[in-house]
Amino acid sequence: MATKPIAKVRKSVPKKVESQVGYFGSYGGRFVPETLMAALQELEAAYEAAKRDKKFKEEIESLLREYAGRPTPLFLAKNLTQKLGGAKIYLKREDLLHTGAHKINNCIGQGLLARRMGKHRIIAETGAGQHGVASATVAALFGMECVVYMGSEDVRRQELNVFRMKLLGAEVVSVNSGSRTLKDAINEAMRDWVTNVRTTHYLLGSVLGAHPYPMMVRDFHRVISREAKAQIMKAEGKLPTAIIACVGGGSNAIGAFYEFIGDKKVQLIGVEAGGRGKALGEHAARFRGGAPGVLQGTYSYVLQDEHGQIAGTHSVSAGLDYPAIGPEHAALAEAGRAEYVAASDAEALAACSMLAKTEGIIPALESSHAVAECVRRAPQMRKSDVVIVNISGRGDKDIGILREQLRF
């Protein structure tokens, strides 16, 4: 009974939401069953208190530095720049972090917060598996129980990460309902949380869900743009012309964008999954085929049919095929501050191959969508322009898919 509002798309939203806590312009909010309201309020209060605690901040910074491997390099991709013949291209190397992706930034922060709250059990959802691996890693580090929910289609696509999670001590629950992907994994994780809220922290992996998650996850990832801004100023003596990042839920992108939002001359470009076609169900481009609605706790752009039912999605990348986008991205798009485009499966695969062959870097298929937009855009730019592409993760997990799709 209590689970229906979690997955339902609603097209209405309260008036004057701009003045309410937890909104980004008209987007965001807290649309959950009453059984979860107290848990979210507890989490919000704990996070606000933690932000004021100098020791909490110092412990996060220490673990990011000593355990995760921050700061990550900002690498000048000379070969790719020369090949494309336009803007100078830098790569923000989040793929070099412990566990292989940006996800560890958020997991360390939320893991410390869960411990501070006295929770001894962590649950998480995962699509590509990187958030599941990072959650299992942090749970092992802090001595916590960990259960990861993953759609059975993603389990099939990401066998390596499933084994990594189990090796780290996590229980992986394969979800066979619905489309058997990330949306369905989130549904099951939320059902678990409703049942076990006193002992369990839901370690949500993106800037999705009900307040305070979009704000909190963004805060844990803003280190990406904080570093990148200092690094590009040191390397070039000026701000970049553009920042490009892939957008599933949108955590790596908002992390890469955040410190540049106030710099109006810096273009912020998010790249969604264009999939294999423009018809509903053939892609996961929310701004191309979606409309505002409420899904799994937040009001944002959602892929939905004419009846308000959640539409199917497709992407070669398991981490980009979620039907909704983080509310802060919706607000940035509506304000005209960020631009959102789409790269197809074929374009992402070609970009992955190009980066591997020019720079010796195999990006995750998620990140390859951002590389694809760089490949399209950079040749049209001036040689004096500077582009930063956020390489959110490495492609080890995708080798099976790459071998199957590229066939060489």
From Swiss-Prot:
InterPro entries: Trp_synth_b_CS, Trp_synth_beta, Trp_synth_beta/beta-like, TrpB-like_PALP, TrpB-like_PALP_sf
Residue numbers bearing the N6-(pyridoxal phosphate)lysine modification: K103
One Gene Ontology term, aspect cellular component: cytoplasm
Catalysed reaction equations from the record: (1S,2R)-1-C-(indol-3-yl)glycerol 3-phosphate + L-serine = D-glyceraldehyde 3-phosphate + L-tryptophan + H2O
Pathway recorded for this protein: Amino-acid biosynthesis; L-tryptophan biosynthesis; L-tryptophan from chorismate: step 5/5
Keywords, alphabetical: Amino-acid biosynthesis, Aromatic amino acid biosynthesis, Lyase, Pyridoxal phosphate, Tryptophan biosynthesis
Class in the EC hierarchy, top level: lyase
Enzyme Commission (EC) number: 4.2.1.20
Alphabetized PROSITE patterns for the sequence: TRP_SYNTHASE_BETA
Cofactor: pyridoxal 5'-phosphate
Presence of the UniProt keyword Repressor in the record: no
Highest taxon above the source species: Bacteria
Subunit and interaction comment: Tetramer of two alpha and two beta chains.
Task performed by this protein: The beta subunit is responsible for the synthesis of L-tryptophan from indole and L-serine.
Family: Belongs to the TrpB family.
Protein name as annotated: Tryptophan synthase beta chain
Species of the source: Koribacter versatilis (strain Ellin345)
Upper lineage: Bacteria, Pseudomonadati, Acidobacteriota, Terriglobia, Terriglobales
